[in-house]
Design a protein with these regions (language model features):
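A composition-driven surface/loop motif
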Residues: 1-168
Length: 168
């Protein structure tokens, strides 16, 4: 087992940072009245890392203004016991089998994703159902990693980003 960090904010956010990287096997948890975890840029979960964010109030439990990248075996848990989203994420990237459990508040969704162009799978659940603002991609939740297909069908017009496509 790796290191763990638990932060609670009594009148703000549990964690407020930029470029968060949670190393392999490590665990980070944030809880606060203005949100559990807030990143003004990217969040990276390395293999086997876990991130949890909680709030009882009227802000997102997790807010990521950049890309949230999850490596194989990593886990994300978000819970908003107030009104808003469990997580608001600009862009999502998943590699391998990951675990996501997301619960949104009374007037929102478990996961709100601004840009999602590829289809992805995760073990877990999202209540209410994940919402994508821009793009045709979606996240499908399954109850066991064995149900994740080896080749995930992509939406019409999807172009996988590679080093070659990024240079164009």
């Amino acid at each position: 087992a790796g290191d763990s960090l638990v932060c609670k904010g009594s009148n703000g956010r549990g964690i407020d940072a930029e470029d968060i990287t949670i190393k392999a096997g490590a665990s980070v948890s944030g809880e606060g009245v203005l949100g559990g975890v807030n990143s003004r840029s990217d969040i990276t979960l390395e293999k086997g890392a876990s991130l949890a964010a909680y709030t009882d109030e009227n802000y997102n439990a997790l807010k990521c203004d950049g890309q949230l990248s999850m490596a194989d075996g990593s886990a994300l848990t978000v819970e908003n016991r107030g009104r808003y989203h469990g997580a608001e994420i600009y862009e999502f990237a998943i590699e391998g089998a990951v675990s996501i459990n997301a619960a949104g508040g009374s007037e929102a969704t478990g996961l709100f994703i601004t840009e999602q162009h590829s289809n992805m799978y995760a073990v877990g659940s999202c209540k209410p159902e994940a919402r994508v603002e821009n793009g045709k991609g979606r996240i499908t939740f399954v109850d066991d990693a064995s149900k994740i297909p080896a080749e995930i069908p992509q939406p019409d017009g999807y172009i996988e980003e590679t080093a070659e496509t990024e240079e164009q």
